[in-house]
Swiss-Prot record:
One of its GO terms (cellular component) is plasma membrane. Pfam families: MFS_1. This is Uncharacterized protein Cj0987c. It comes from the Bacteria. SUPFAM superfamilies: MFS general substrate transporter. Keywords: Cell membrane, Membrane, Transmembrane, Transmembrane helix. It is a multi-pass membrane protein. It is found in: Cell membrane. InterPro entries: MFS, MFS_dom, MFS_Efflux_Transporters, MFS_trans_sf. One of its GO terms (molecular function) is transmembrane transporter activity. PROSITE patterns: MFS. The chain crosses the membrane at residues 12-32, 52-72, 86-106, 109-129, 136-156, 168-188, 214-234, 254-274, 292-312. The lineage of its organism: Bacteria, Pseudomonadati, Campylobacterota, Epsilonproteobacteria, Campylobacterales.
Length: 321
C-alpha cells in the first residue's frame, strides 16, 4: 500500500466522508422521531401512519444488503457506494412533496441508501487502512450511528426551529449528504483486479443462497424495529401516554433513547466475554433477543424513571451483544 503524503490526506478525506455520511443519516433518522408530533399535526396522521414513516427505513434496510452487493458487483465499490448512498439525498425533495405516499417513497429510498452506507463501511476501510489502524477505523466507523442518533435527539428541535418547519430541517440533512457524496467522487477509488469481479459474483450467489444469510436477516428484524422505536415511538409514548408530568416527559423522551444508544457501545464487549466462556453465538442471539423484549416491556410500563433508565441501558447492551 502506497505511503505518500497525498495518500494519507486522501484516506483521511475518505474516512471523514464515510463516517459523516452515515452519521448525518442517523441524525436525520433520530430527528424524524423527535419531530413526529409536528409531522403528524401537519399531515393529520394517526399513530400507525406516523410510525410507518420511520418504519419504512427499517423495511428498506432488510433489502439493503442485497441491493448494495448488486451495486458493488455491477459498478465497483466507488460508483456502487455513490449510487447507493445518493438515494439518501432523495430527502431534498421533502420540501416539495405534500402527499403521504410521496414521503413514504422518499423514506424507503433513504433506507436503501443508508443500508449501502453501512454495508460499505468495512470494505472501504479495508482499501485504505491496514492491521491495527484498520481495526481502529472499523470500530470508530461503527460509532457513527451512535454519534448521529445522539446529535439528532439533542439538536432536532433546535434545527427545526431555525428553519421554521420540519420539512426544511430534514431536507437540510439530505443536502449535507449530497455534498459529501460529490466529494466522494474525487477521493474514492475502485480496485483494479479483473478477477475480483468473478469472485464477487460467486460470493454474492453463495451469500444469497445461504440459510445463515436469510436467518440473520429475519432474526435482526426484531432488534432493528426495537432500535427504531427508541427514537420514534418511545418519545411520543412518554410525551402523550405514559402519564408523566410535562417536565418529566420532556426529559424522558430525550434521555431514554440517548442512554440506550450510548449503551450499544458496550454490548460487543459483553458478547466477547460470553464467547470466551464458550457460549455459542446462537444462544447469545436468542437470549439477547429475549432480554431486549423484557427491557422494552419494562420501559413501557414502569413508572419509575430510574428503573426505566436502567432498562434502557440494558436494552442497548443486549442489542449489540
Amino acid at each position: 500500500m502506497e505511503k505518500s503524503l497525498l495518500f494519507h490526506f486522501r484516506r483521511i478525506g475518505v474516512e471523514f466522508i464515510i463516517f459523516s455520511v452515515y452519521a448525518v443519516f442517523s441524525i436525520s433518522w433520530a430527528a424524524t422521531g423527535s419531530l413526529m408530533p409536528l409531522i403528524s399535526n401537519d399531515l393529520a396522521l394517526n399513530t400507525q401512519q406516523a410510525t410507518l414513516i420511520t418504519s419504512m427505513i427499517v423495511v428498506a434496510k432488510i433489502f439493503g444488503a442485497s441491493f448494495t452487493a448488486f451495486l458493488v458487483y455491477k459498478f465497483g465499490l466507488k460508483k456502487g457506494y455513490f449510487l447507493g448512498c445518493i438515494l439518501m439525498s432523495s430527502g431534498i425533495f421533502l420540501s416539495f412533496v405534500d402527499s403521504y405516499s410521496g414521503i413514504l417513497i422518499i423514506r424507503f429510498l433513504t433506507g436503501l441508501g443508508s443500508a449501502c452506507a453501512l454495508v460499505c463501511l468495512v470494505p472501504i476501510a479495508q482499501q485504505w487502512f491496514e492491521k491495527k489502524a484498520l481495526h481502529f477505523v472499523i470500530s470508530f466507523n461503527i460509532t457513527s450511528n451512535l454519534v448521529g442518533i445522539t446529535l439528532g435527539l439533542v439538536l432536532a428541535e433546535s434545527i427545526s426551529n431555525y428553519f421554521g418547519n420540519w420539512r426544511d430541517s430534514l431536507s437540510f440533512y439530505a443536502w449535507i449528504n449530497l455534498i459529501l457524496l460529490i466529494l466522494w467522487l474525487f477521493v474514492g477509488k475502485d480496485e483494479n483486479k479483473k478477477e475480483e469481479k468473478k469472485n464477487n459474483a460467486k460470493d454474492l450467489i453463495y451469500a444469497l443462497k445461504s440459510r445463515v444469510t436469510w436467518g440473520m436477516i429475519i432474526f435482526y428484524i426484531g432488534p432493528i424495529l426495537f432500535l427504531n422505536s427508541l427514537f420514534t415511538f418511545l418519545p411520543t409514548f412518554y410525551a402523550q401516554y405514559a402519564g408523566f408530568s410535562k417536565e418529566l416527559a420532556d426529559f424522558a423522551k430525550k434521555e431514554i433513547p440517548a442512554l440506550a444508544n450510548f449503551a450499544i457501545i458496550f454490548g460487543p464487549y459483553l458478547g466477547l466475554f460470553f464467547k470466551r466462556k464458550n457460549i455459542s453465538f446462537k444462544i447469545m442471539l436468542l437470549s439477547g433477543g429475549a432480554c431486549i423484549f423484557i427491557c422494552g416491556f419494562c420501559m413501557l410500563f414502569l413508572q419509575n424513571l430510574v428503573l426505566i433508565q436502567i432498562f434502557a441501558v440494558l436494552s442497548g447492551i443486549f442489542y449489540s451483544m
